[in-house]
Regions:
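Short intrinsically disordered, low-complexity coil segments enriched in acidic
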Residues: 1-5, 86, 228
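Active-site-adjacent structural elements in folded domains
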Residues: 18-20, 81-88, 140-142
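A general structural signal for short secondary-structure junctions and capping/turn motifs
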Residues: 6, 21-26, 32-34, 54-55, ...
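Carbohydrate-binding surface patches
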Residues: 33-36, 41-43, 80-122, 152, ...
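Glycan-recognition surfaces
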Residues: 1-45
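Catalytic cores of secreted or luminal carbohydrate-active enzymes
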Residues: 28-78, 152-174, 178
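Extracytoplasmic
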Residues: 111, 120-131, 135-228
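Surface beta-strand/loop "capping" patches
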Residues: 76-98, 167-170, 176, 210-218
Length: 228
């Protein structure tokens, strides 16, 4: 997520909507492309696309997340033990009280997820908008929202809190790597890379830092209301 900004987007390749995926898989596919601010390139035969697939591609609320002027890419803040991922990003105002979240279930079974507002840095009463269903949900007043996610499906919500809490965890995989590559022998060449790590909060880590003066990692989006 550190590499996405206005005019610089991670291209996740063309969309496979309308080409045989299940409805749940299409929601995941298009929803993740939108919350990651990936370019949206339709890759199906538009003369034969199913009506539900076309309606998904025309979902204005999802497209608004994709085209949000902050141009941010969502990042993982939590991987639950049942394999469900929680993604989040600011929309509309940087470090504001409105955030987009995606709860992604890649498993082959329906899963439950307890969305704790502390994990997405929101406080007080939180308004919830389901962007797939185009409807407002019950306001979260006790800090936790319980969600069921079918197999291979994703739920995407717009959350509007009363207050914004300061982010307390900056995962390694959200940092900028000045010298990054995923090929070759990184240590001897002085390049860092990202790797999987189940014991880490977001399920990822950074490896092979050092061995070159420019082989470092940094967070470029740290925010605090006060100095010090």
């Amino acid at each position: 997520s550190a590499y996405a900004s206005e005019g610089k987007y991670n291209d996740m390749d063309m969309l496979e909507i309308g080409r045989g995926l299940s409805e749940a898989e299409e929601r995941t596919h298009f929803g993740m492309w939108c919350i990651q601010s990936s370019p949206l390139l339709i890759g199906c035969d538009m003369t034969a696309i199913p009506a539900k697939s076309l309606a998904l591609l025309k979902n204005k609320e999802l497209i608004a997340i994709n085209q949000d002027p902050l141009a941010l890419q969502a990042y993982v803040v939590k991987v639950q033990q049942n394999g469900v991922y929680l993604y989040v990003k600011d929309i509309q105002i940087l470090n504001g009280t409105t955030r987009a979240v995606a709860i992604y279930n890649p498993t082959d079974n329906e899963q439950s997820f307890a969305l704790n507002m502390n994990d997405v840095d929101l406080d007080g009463k939180v308004k919830v908008r389901d962007v797939f269903a185009h409807e407002d949900m019950a306001e979260v007043t006790k800090g936790v929202m319980h969600v069921n996610i079918p197999r291979h499906d994703t739920r995407i919500f717009i959350l509007k809190g009363e207050k914004r809490k300061l982010r307390s965890i900056y995962e390694a995989e959200t940092a900028w790597l000045e010298r990054y590559q995923c090929l070759g022998i990184n240590n001897s060449l002085g390049y860092a890379k990202y790797g999987d790590a189940k014991f880490c909060s977001g399920g990822g880590k950074v490896e092979w830092l050092g061995n070159h003066k420019d082989n470092y990692m940094e967070w470029r989006n740290i925010y605090s209301k006060e100095d010090g």
